[in-house]
Amino acid sequence: MSKMTFTPRRAALLAGISIGSMMVGGHAMAQDAATASQAAPADDEAAIVVTGVRASLSSAQSIKRNSDVIVDSIVAEDIGKLPDRNVAEALQRIPGIQVQRQYGEGSSVAIRGLTQVRTELNGRDIFTASGANQLSLEDIPSELLAGIDVYKNPSADLIEDQLSGTINFRTRKPFDFDGFKAAATLTQSHFDLVDKFKPSASLLLSDRWETGIGEIGILASVSYQKTAFRQDTISTEPFYTLDPSVPADAAVLDTLGRTGQTTTLPHGTGIGQVYGDRRRLGTDISVQWRPSDTLELTAEVFRSDYKFRLDDYSFFAYTSTSAIVPQPGAPFTYADNGDFQSGTFIDLPIGDNTSAQTRRSKTTDYSLNLNWKATPNLTISADGQYVDATTKNLRSIFGLNGTADTLYQNISGSVPVVNIGSSTGLTNPATYDSAFYLDNLNESKASDKTARLDAEYRFDAGILSSIKAGLRFADRRNKTIDTGYRYTGLSSIPTDLETVNLDDFFRGDADLFGNIIAFKRGIIRNYQATLDTLGIASAPSYVQSGTNQQLQKTYTGYATAFFKADPVDGNIGVRVVRTDLDVSGYYQQTPIIIDENGNETNGPTVFNPIAVSRSYTSVLPSLNLRIHLTDDLQLRLAAAKNISRPSFTQLNPSLTITEPGSAQQDQVHSTSGGNPYLKPMKSDNLDASLEWYFSRTGSLTAAAFYKRIKNYIQTAVSTRNVTFENGDSYNYEVTSYNNVATGKVKGFELAYQQFFDFLPGPLSGLGMQANFTYVDSKAPSPATAGPVTDVPLELLSKYNYNIVGIYELGGLSARVAYNWRSKYVVTTAGNGTGNLPIFNEPFGQLDASMSYNVTPQFALTLDGVNLTNTRRATYFGIDTRPRDVVVNDRRISLTARISY
């Protein structure tokens, strides 16, 4: 366990100083404290051992203070104890980081407004086999980590492809401990909405020995974690506008009593209820060998095995143009801008879906490092790594179609009212006239072979303190296969149905329509049982158009000079990287064939291979300066260029085109695909940070940043003319990715942390962390039809803050943490947005934990997440067009921790 010491005399000195004088007169206070410390004879005083939260914050502050670049860190309080049990939620406490949640858990993050985040494990690549270039943060068990470092600006010795920053996950090594170490945790968690208990456990064993061939250390760590969730959603989408200048729309407006008035109506509304669970199994084995004082070898195998499963019910009513029929005598109500607010529709189609989804991801990282101090001044490091990752996904959907008598909808309140009525009953199979089944399977496999050689030479005197240079080669491969969605129309309504009780839906706070019917959960969860029940012979086959292979090789060299000329130190360097990219896929065309009776059928599908090869070289200079204004006050200035390569999903060249039949001639034809010709995004970065460290765990920092991003990748819709073999041509709206924009991101961060040791008695255990981030961004949004407008970057809140109250004294520690972020754009390319982006409303969440050390080796911890049951909501650009409202679980966990 990491330990720090300070003297009682210094504690007494700090106890006599108020918070106000500390914050205003910090320089003088720091000098006095240093003088007192030097004057105190250590032999006459008993040292106070600092552990737990204080040691964690002190270690993180030390990393930030002494780093060559701008970095923020999280350090585990003890083995298996990050401040938050979810990795993404731990990261959200860092200034400049915003988290995205999926089914109640943090799943991904953005750094300073950008989602192009690089993920590393102990300074090396780590990723999930998927369309992204990074690790899914859901996959990592937090118990395996010693800490997390977030690099916010680059230096030449850091690996490129970090447009927003790099997140480096650090694991423990056997030489981190003085000798034998054993630690274990056992956790039981309750998830209140789904009302389930789930266990978690972790174990670490480590030891080191002197042998005839040198010192050897072995560490083995394993973590097993299960969680459950339920998510309830009320949705309204999409919205369509009726234009009185369009004859067809004008006729509908006449029936609504809205003649000559532009009016917007919802064309779909309903509810969804999702049940699921996650299972994380992580293992880490590390072996270190130090044959001499100048040579050290480290071998490590890290494995993450993640399982995700859900099944859900959804029930929707569709108010299409032909079904916009108000109930007689009950006219619709509208907002002042013409947006629908409430009313009753009659005789409208309904859909009742039951679905299941599974994901299994495995990532295994093999690494070997040699560190050799060749001379007192020269250190050489050689590093090799192999990563193997796989992901398998399955989606299975059973659907019923029918007709409802009425739909009452009121979207004017904070919780929309959805009330669907049927004279035959929504739980009666006779209400439904048809059924269908959809299934899809896809697999991804990725690998990375990396070799790296670094050398650093330190100078004994002069301005130049050291020179560091290195070479790196990486061979990254990614392959995806996909069946596409297979549609199976069912000849009759199956009998394997059950009633779903919705009495406690939305915690009982929703005005709802009662129970529904669904395909049996016990069957839909089992894919083969579902196929057997529905009489489907086998799973769908993988199709050529679902096959995408990509090979990316990078060749890198860098050189960095580190210098020091009091009061300034820093580094200047350049990184040069060549990227060779090979992308392949298939272009699929399916024509329409008309037989002698005039019947239309799909003709034979034609698959045309697509192969694209590209190379480009990037030159990435960087400069980092640190100016020591006083012993405790420093100013950092940084400038750098960086790149972010397109993701594998964005580069996927495969495209599927189906010729429209006669009934679809006048409809808009659309498809989607990637773009293998995308360029990497390039950024020019300027950073500044003013940092005041007034105690071991006390600091006040302010940082400002500016990024200008060229070749910004966005979703865009373009019109493409497609000619089929019969000579017929059609225009298709193709949704893809383009380098269409120059984006700008600027902002600042404020952060403060302190323990109030000067307070008397038990109050001296109080402490606080607080940070605030402001990010302003602009980029053109050409994703939908209509004029191009400037909107904030997707998933970026302009404001977010964290306030954390801390208490630690004796064996008791506690923490209450509140995280808040302002509204943000979810997407600019949503269904039926009317050229308006989808926004997430402002969102805040309260979490807390309390821990007590029963003995020096045994502790109990109580954690609570989402204590206030916060609702999340989205809307279509303006407040009168709500999209959905979501509730998730509150989680309470009790952990027993033992360490020797």
PLM region spans:
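Transmembrane beta-barrel wall of Gram-negative outer-membrane proteins
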Residues: 194-324, 330-335, 359-369, 374, ...
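Outer-membrane beta-barrel signature, preferentially recognizing the C-terminal barrel domain
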Residues: 348, 355, 359-363, 546, ...
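Short acidic/polar hinge/loop motifs at secondary-structure boundaries
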Residues: 124-152, 203
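C-terminal beta-signal and adjacent terminal beta-strands/loops
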Residues: 820-829, 851-900
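N-terminal periplasmic "start-of-domain" segments of outer-membrane beta-barrel proteins
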Residues: 49-80, 107-108, 124, 129
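A beta-strand signature from Gram-negative outer-membrane beta-barrel systems
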Residues: 94, 140-185, 231, 760, ...
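Extracytoplasmic beta-strand/coil segments of soluble accessory domains associated
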Residues: 36, 88-125
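Gram-negative outer-membrane beta-barrel transporters
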Residues: 705-709, 718, 724-828, 868
